[in-house]
Amino acid sequence: MASMSLFELTRGFADIPSALANISILDLVLDSRQVTEGSGFIAVQGTQTDGRRFIADALDRGASLVLAESPDGKISDSRVIGMPGLKKHLGELAKRFYGDPSRQLALLAVTGTNGKTSISDYIGQLLRLLGESAGTIGTLGARTRSGESVASQNTTPDIISLNRQLADWVDQGIRFAAIEASSHALDQSRLDGLTLHTGIFSNLTRDHLDYHENMVAYQQAKLHLFQDFCPDRVLFNADDENTFPAREFASQSALGISLRDASADVFAQVTSEAASGLSFLLHSPYGSTSITTKVHGRFNAFNVTAAIMAVCGLGFAFSDVAAAASYLQAVDGRMQAVGGGEDVRVVVDYAHTPDALASALFTLETSCPGDLWVVFGCGGDRDSGKRTEMGRIASGLASKLVITNDNPRTEDASVIASQIASGCMPNCDGADVLIELDRAAAIVYAIKSARPGDTVLIAGKGHETYQIIGRAQHAFSDVEHARQALAARGVADV
């Protein structure tokens, strides 16, 4: 286990009493519950709780010392050290303690409203298909060379956890890592001090306005990935002008990816959206070829292309990367088919924003011979302004709507559902709308009621294995409930 003295860790940041200078630190943690013997506990004010409240707990658990922005005067212990400006130095402290791991591997970061998980996962898959070791960090947790996952509470972990994970991968010989960079993480400086090889900006559409207040602030948070880190290479969406400013901050090169403009730096021309998967012609500075994949959704042409360009930017041959793309697997909870689709086609997708819901429904509508059903809701204690918009979109593209719970948290679930339904009414065009707040019952109703040839989209939760009601998490999986409903219908999962 690596260790560092307090003097080495804080040199240049704080004046440490000589009697404490040689205290050995075995790890850094922000959560007192993770403290083990010899840990250094970092006590700072967070967005949801104040770490300084847990100084005593950290010491009881065996912390060798506590660094606190402004220590609680009630605790008189020489191991509690005040460090003004501690929070803004977290990135540098973590980088120093863990040996600056982002410089020892090629780190790629993906930001954007939609597509972060898919792009980062595709990058990891492509690298593994090419025989390389790669890790990914994001909504699906931390995944290593063989694809196994370790759950993470946030899309982008705190900067200490990030550095610890990257350092562990460096020790394992992993040479590449792709991470999701959420707007919250960028705004809260959770990536500070990292060195980026590639930055990718997928798109910007409405989301998180409960946090950012307006789209300008939301865009600025995303742009921190480029302004603050100046990646060697930048990939942006040539079809979304909100992403254009990112190209100005590339240290070496920037490429715009388009699904519409043949004159763009990179052009992905969709040629087929079949039950077997998505195909497109790819034209890029690295070469041109036809790409055939097993993934679904026109929007995935952008995601796959971004991953291909990112991996080519690491120095891999275009022909090899393009060939590997045909073996890409669908990302958990992203246009994930449940069952064989011979009777009723059932798809689970994470779509929880207006744009993502529209993209998923449009994709399924084009290949649905029968009625298109959608089971969805909107999260509580989150941007309430998108609820009516999602109702409008759903009623405009689907024939049958079942509005239900989607992590209502502390809000009244019936109020959320009514707000969604109010958006459906002016645009209903004959769509049937049912409110069933029990999400399990809603899934059963849609799958049981659908006729052969119909498609049922279960949107909003994707890979999640829980439902948040009040402040408690309850076990819940859209995929498992869909499988059970199909089994009750007499359809075996494949």
What do these predicted ranges mean?
Residues 64-70, 200, 235-238, 373-377, ...:
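Short internal beta-strands
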Residues 1-18, 37-40, 50-53, 286, ...:
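ATP-dependent carboxylate-amine ligase
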Residues 70-72, 139-140, 183, 204, ...:
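Short, ordered loop/turn segments at secondary-structure junctions
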Residues 68, 73-77, 172, 187, ...:
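Acidic, Mg2+-coordinating active-site environments of NTP-dependent enzymes
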Residues 1-92, 96, 241, 267-269, ...:
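N-terminal leader/targeting and accessory segments in enzymes
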Residues 73-74, 142-144, 185-187, 241-245, ...:
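Short, active-site-adjacent cap segments at secondary-structure transitions
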Residues 90-238, 244-250, 305, 367-368:
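Phosphate-binding loop of NTP-binding sites
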